[in-house]
């Protein structure tokens, strides 16, 4: 899995015969079939409704492409299916405990912080050093260097991603993880410094979509802190958003979505272009609502020369039709609702992990209305989505130990898992080891068990011991005698003066058992 994350940041490409592959696709093509088999067998905390919806989304995409582009079905679905389902199921398989998730958070935060010198150099000089180095390697290709006009006197940082907005989105995903998820296992100084670095790197992408996700996450964090003791604070927030939407709809001659997009851009020209894309995108959706238009070019005004569409959700509806779009959105929304409604009272670590994941994807959901994602970052988005699904079955510290024991005995508990993924999981956990060892105890340490007094406990036998050594005779005297012999022989306590000699025959014993 670490190899997958490295290839997300450094999308090295190469040709394998007629196939154009990159590191992410190669890893996922190798792993998707065994991991998907295990997922459908319920090995990764069960099979959820949204698992089925995501699979149906890809199957419908196959149908839509077969109708529109029959000669490109295998090639396109092979890459899109591997990136979408492969990234999702990889996270479902390897991120299933708090330690796994915290290790992932540390990896992402550290990876972004390490890009700071490269990002500063690129935004000042306009030279993506990492891309230039990759392109010098024999037999290896990298993504194209995207040239844009400078904004605010700075070049947009692309690093090694396919687009500057992808770098900004990668940085924004790590923000809530650094500030919220790691709050119980990191020192405050590290949290604030790393969060500031993440925000600065996100800014250097000079992408309105990425900055929108960052600002929305900061707003949600502030709202949670300000109204932390208010029971219905999130219902209040939904009500405020609804009131704001209604107010804009009544007072503006534009739709609320167009007003929102006009303020979520760096320039009025960009806002105008996105408004036209929205209008003509819906024209294409309604022209082919069932199977979409597939990979065919979309109808648009002559003034829009590029065939790109800066709206991921609209692109899904346009390409695969309303059924494909609906399956994806239902699965996406259902998972967020289920995870968002989980309560982890008494376990601050799980509470902060859940909150950070929900904040991340609430921000990302709005951002995807202003950007499109493809290739490695497309897979990464749904990898991070799958990385939070384990929270649905997670149990807070000290809750239902009997249930936890039964899960461990059946092999479904994360702690009891062993198998082929053990080396990779051990490697990933080492990233979280410093934080976990330095963190305060999540629950009070159990009080030491006092030594049993010889006389006090002789007449008060423990029920579990009696259950382990039942007597064939229900007489109280026989039961006490058998318990005394068992306790003496087992070393559970010292013999009392009234205890029988363990070597004497038992009067209640009628023969071998």
Predicted region positions:
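Membrane-interface helix-loop-helix junctions at transmembrane boundaries of multi-pass membrane enzymes
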Residues: 37-52, 180-193, 228-235, 336-358
């Amino acid at each position: 899995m670490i190899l997958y994350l490295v290839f997300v940041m450094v999308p090295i490409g190469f040709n394998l015969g007629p196939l154009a592959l990159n590191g992410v696709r190669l890893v996922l093509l190798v792993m998707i079939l065994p991991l998907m088999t295990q997922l459908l067998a319920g090995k990764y905390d069960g099979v959820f409704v949204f698992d089925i919806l995501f699979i149906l989304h890809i199957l419908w995409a196959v149908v839509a492409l077969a109708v529109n582009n029959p000669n490109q079905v295998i090639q396109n679905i092979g890459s899109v299916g591997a990136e979408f389902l492969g990234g999702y199921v990889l996270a479902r398989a390897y991120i299933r405990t708090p330690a796994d998730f915290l290790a992932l958070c540390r990896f992402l935060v550290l990876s972004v912080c390490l890009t700071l010198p490269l990002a500063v150099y690129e935004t000042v000089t306009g030279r993506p050093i990492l891309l230039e180095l990759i392109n010098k390697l024999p037999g290896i290709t990298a993504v194209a260097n995207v040239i844009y006009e400078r904004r605010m006197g700075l070049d947009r940082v692309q690093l090694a991603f396919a687009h500057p907005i992808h770098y900004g989105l990668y940085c924004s995903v790590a923000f809530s993880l650094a500030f919220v998820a790691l709050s119980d296992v990191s020192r405050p100084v590290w949290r604030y410094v790393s969060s500031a670095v993440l925000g600065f790197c996100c800014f250097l992408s000079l992408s309105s979509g990425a900055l929108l996700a960052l600002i929305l996450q900061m707003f949600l964090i502030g709202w949670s802190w300000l109204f932390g003791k208010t029971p219905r604070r999130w219902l209040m927030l939904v009500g405020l958003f609804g009131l704001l939407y209604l107010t804009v709809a009544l007072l503006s001659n534009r739709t609320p979505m167009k007003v929102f997009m006009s303020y979520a851009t760096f320039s009025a020209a960009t806002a105008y272009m996105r408004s036209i894309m929205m209008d003509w995108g819906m024209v294409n959706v309604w022209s082919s609502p069932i199977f979409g238009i597939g990979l065919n070019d979309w109808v648009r005004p002559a003034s829009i020369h590029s065939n790109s569409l800066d709206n991921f959700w609209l692109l899904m509806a346009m390409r695969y039709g309303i059924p494909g779009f609906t399956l994806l959105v239902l699965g996406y929304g259902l998972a967020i609702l289920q995870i968002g409604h989980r309560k982890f009272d008494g376990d601050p670590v799980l509470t902060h992990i859940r909150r950070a994941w929900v904040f991340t994807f609430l921000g990302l959901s709005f951002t995807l209305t202003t950007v499109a994602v493809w290739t490695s970052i497309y897979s990464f988005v749904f990898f991070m989505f799958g990385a939070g699904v384990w929270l649905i079955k997670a149990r807070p510290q000290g809750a239902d130990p009997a249930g936890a024991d039964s899960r461990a005995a059946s092999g479904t508990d994360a702690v009891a898992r062993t198998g082929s993924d053990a080396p990779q999981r051990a490697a990933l956990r080492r990233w979280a080891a410093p934080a976990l060892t330095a963190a305060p105890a999540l629950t009070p340490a159990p009080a030491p068990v006092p030594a049993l007094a010889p006389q006090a406990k002789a007449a008060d036998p423990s029920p579990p011991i009696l259950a382990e050594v039942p007597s064939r005779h229900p007489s109280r005297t026989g039961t006490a005698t058998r318990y005394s012999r068992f306790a003496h022989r087992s070393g559970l306590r010292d013999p009392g003066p009234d205890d029988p000699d363990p070597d004497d025959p038992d009067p209640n014993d009628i023969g071998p058992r």
